Design a protein with these regions (language model features):
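FAD-binding subdomain of flavoenzyme oxidoreductases
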Residues: 1-114, 339-349, 353-362
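Residue-level signal for pocket-adjacent positions within structured domains
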Residues: 32, 48-51, 198, 225, ...
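Short, amphipathic alpha-helical segments
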Residues: 47, 234, 238, 286, ...
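C-terminal substrate-recognition/cap domain of FAD-linked oxidoreductases
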Residues: 55-61, 65-284, 293-295, 299-300, ...
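Amphipathic alpha-helical segments in well-structured domains
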Residues: 177, 285-289, 325-329
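Activity-critical C-terminal alpha-helical subdomain
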Residues: 214-221, 315-362
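Hydrophobic, well-ordered secondary-structure elements that form the walls
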Residues: 270, 307, 337
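Short acidic/histidine-rich active-site segments
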Residues: 302-309, 344-345
């Protein structure tokens, strides 16, 4: 597959073979249901849920690679692929923002994005506590300035934001970071710009290693990635995150969890640790999954931004998109794979019962 101009598409559709049939059927599917697909598409910057039918045809280019990418091997097999890469900037500085109150989060994220950070990450107070507990001797002395700063600004932060700014020179990267910090001064929150790559590394280490700390340091519990990739519009974060935390609160004695992710996108990764040998604890998973995904959908988000559906999220696609759009996913599967050979029970045909039957119990 490759992007096709309109005249190339017409040529493909004239083919009297399986490939020609795919192009004819998919063209009819997306053009006849264009309004439905447009309305169903979540208003977020990343979305891996379902089939990306809305990306195939823009009126000028017909591109089935955008459908095949992210289809989890359910439509066929990729034997060769070509990637376009970019050359990263040589220098970077990190703007670190400590939030004691989530109320201004939406405005802070929006204001930071106007300065075009290269990356914009975050982690919550649970992540920071975990790092302080298990990485204390590695980083304790390096965090003395931050400890003093946050103590003066109301104590332990609820959320830490990491905005990375890059440039072709050290001075360019530093100027971008300082300009952004100056632009955020009105929010009256603790923040600082890293002095060097080594200074920034302690923050990245917490973001990067939090999952490994959970897995290796907390005994008797296993990872349970059932709501590990949610995304909502960034402008709703101030309201969404407190509601999300409230859903987990009743189960705080049955799980350990952290929330980290990409603040600029509103994309968060939650991977609880739970004692999966307990039937009572296992019963929490479908109940909490239902509640979290209902909340995400209510805020106009997606149940998966990056990690895709698999057997865990496929049963929730009708809830997210509605029966009509889900029927188009089923039709797409039949067009490409009429015998249901490729990776069944993903994207379509999955049930909660099937997913739960594959849950670890030890």
């Amino acid at each position: 597959f490759r992007p096709l101009l309109a005249f190339e598409l017409r040529k493909k559709m004239r083919q009297a073979d399986f490939e020609g049939g795919i192009y004819r059927d998919m063209y009819c599917l997306v053009t006849e249901n264009a309004a439905l697909l447009k309305a169903a598409r979540p208003t977020v910057s990343k979305n891996s849920a379902g089939y990306a039918l809305w990306d195939i045809w823009d009126g000028k280019i017909f591109d089935l690679t955008k459908l095949f990418t992210g289809s989890q091997g359910t439509l066929g097999m990729i034997t060769e692929i070509e990637f376009k890469t970019i050359r990263p900037k040589k220098h970077s500085r990190l703007l670190v923002i400590f939030l004691n109150d989530l109320a201004p989060l939406c405005d802070i994220v929006a204001a930071t994005l106007t300065h075009h950070p290269e990356s914009f990450e975050s982690y919550d107070n649970h992540t920071l506590w975990l790092a302080m507990r298990y990485m204390l001797f590695r980083f304790a002395w390096q965090f003395i300035p931050e400890i003093v700063m946050v103590a003066r600004n109301g104590g332990f932060p609820q959320l830490v934001l990491l905005a990375e700014f890059t440039g072709d020179s050290k001075s360019e990267a530093l100027l971008k970071a300082r300009t952004a910090m100056h632009g955020l001064a009105r929010f009256k929150c603790a923040m600082r710009v890293s002095n060097s790559a080594k200074d920034a590394e302690k923050y990245w280490a917490i973001r990067r290693e939090s999952f490994n700390l959970l897995r290796t340091k907390i005994k008797g519990r296993q990872t349970a990635p059932f709501v590990d990739d949610i995304i909502v519009p960034p402008e709703s974060l101030s309201q969404f995150l407190p509601e999300l935390n409230a859903l987990f609160t009743p189960y705080k004695n049955d799980m350990t969890y952290t929330i980290a992710g990409h603040a600029g996108n509103g994309n968060f990764h939650i991977i609880p640790l739970m004692d999966l040998s307990s039937a009572r604890v296992r019963r929490i998973i479908p109940m909490l999954t239902d509640a979290v995904y209902a909340l995400v959908i209510r805020y106009g988000g997606s149940i998966t931004a990056e990690h895709n559906d698999g057997i865990v999220r496929t049963p929730y696609l009708p809830q997210m998109y509605g029966a009509e759009v889900y029927a188009l996913f089923e039709k797409t599967k039949r067009i490409f794979d009429p015998q249901n050979i490729f990776n069944p029970h993903k994207k379509v045909g999955g049930t909660k019962e099937y997913a739960l039957s594959h849950m670890r119990t030890e």
